Amino acid sequence: MGNNVVVLGTQWGDEGKGKIVDLLTERAKYVVRYQGGHNAGHTLVINGEKTVLHLIPSGILRENVTSIIGNGVVLSPSALMKEMKELEDRGIPVRERLLLSEACPLILDYHVALDNAREKARGAKAIGTTGRGIGPAYEDKVARRGLRVGDLFDKETFAEKLKEVMEYHNFQLVNYYKVEAVDYQKVLDDTMAVADILTSMVVDVSDLLDQARQRGDFVMFEGAQGTLLDIDHGTYPYVTSSNTTAGGVATGSGLGPRYVDYVLGILKAYSTRVGAGPFPTELFDETGEFLCKQGNEYGATTGRRRRTGWLDTVAVRRAVQLNSLSGFCLTKLDVLDGLKEVKLCVAYRMPDGREVTTTPLAADDWKGVEPIYETMPGWSESTFGVKDRSGLPQAALNYIKRIEELTGVPIDIISTGPDRTETMILRDPFDA
């Protein structure tokens, strides 16, 4: 039996993690975010009602679940307050269900200003960040000048630290990027206005998780973004600024690494990517447009159109290696309904003619990579909302089986629609 279950994306994000976390939290006592910030966009559809969460864990809608934001998350006070208000306006008692690590780095206005100034300065070489200050906040953390939630307990010292760090960043903004300085007093006033709310939710997360482990409580760890955007293992520099792989659970929450019992990789039935960076199977034809339209591939956070393409099992195998995956949840299978044929990328042809079955490491090494496809028959029958494996067309079952063969990982859950009920659980991670 797995008490500590990790749910993470195996591609470039947007795989459908939020729905699956929400579904599986029916049995969980805690749901923990361990990396990223409000650059994530987790969409839940429950009884036809749509909820988009960016920072708060997806378990917040469950009455008997405690949601935790771990130390690996960079926390924007303004984004958190906005999200809390939206949920509280719908009658959800967020403050009774949400806890924070005091070690969460804060994202403040100057981080956002830096993020946007840098992207503008990069011009055609822009990374495609969400412009929410995520990267600069992580930079401050590593440089040991970042302000954290715990600093809000001493307001006088916080004001002094803020003044010092803002002098440093405003110098860059004005003299290097040639943009306006960020107003110190406004940042201080805005942060102080919510300081007591934030500190009232602080808890020792590592100790709480260890106590939960000793009691045998079920805990779900909710990943954001996707494996191929990992700061160390992704398509650098076109990556996010945190560790999106399973290793980030231990460092981003304080759970001992030996206590991770099951890692569920969320795998979209095709590939998508937002922003710049390598994408060997990207489609620029009517099939790519079909996938975008049928899959409603627009970012929950930015509204940007996602790039679309065939499923890349070479890249997914890298995710299997990096995360020691226990099983997959295959999402958006229904988007492929109606295609005469479906393709799986099984290898790459490098510019020198070599065929390889592993991904390059740096973004520059992906240049000129051509996908080698295996083509399979598609299916005309609808898989939307199918809740039993026997109800799937044979061609869809063949597609599923081939993914399992190419990756060496079983598909334990199949999602056939956005609602939590439109799901087949073949093996429950908490029972594995």
Swiss-Prot record:
Cofactor(s) needed for function: Mg(2+)
Enzyme class, first EC level, given as a word: ligase
Annotated GO CC locations: cytoplasm
Gene Ontology terms describing biological process: 'de novo' AMP biosynthetic process; IMP metabolic process
Keywords in alphabetical order: Cytoplasm, GTP-binding, Ligase, Magnesium, Metal-binding, Nucleotide-binding, Purine biosynthesis
Residues that, per the record, bind IMP: 14-17, 39-42, 130, 144, 225, 240, 304
Alphabetized SMART domains for the sequence: Adenylsucc_synt
This enzyme's EC code(s): 6.3.4.4
Binding site for Mg(2+): 14, 41
MF term (GO), any: adenylosuccinate synthase activity
Coiled coil: none
Annotated catalysed reactions: IMP + L-aspartate + GTP = N(6)-(1,2-dicarboxyethyl)-AMP + GDP + phosphate + 2 H(+)
Amino-acid positions noted as binding substrate in the UniProt annotation, renumbered to this chain: 300-306
Quaternary data: Homodimer.
Family classification: Belongs to the adenylosuccinate synthetase family.
Function summary: Plays an important role in the de novo pathway of purine nucleotide biosynthesis. Catalyzes the first committed step in the biosynthesis of AMP from IMP.
UniProt-recorded name of the protein: Adenylosuccinate synthetase
Organism annotation: Salmonella schwarzengrund (strain CVM19633)
Lineage: Bacteria, Pseudomonadati, Pseudomonadota, Gammaproteobacteria, Enterobacterales
The encoding gene: purA
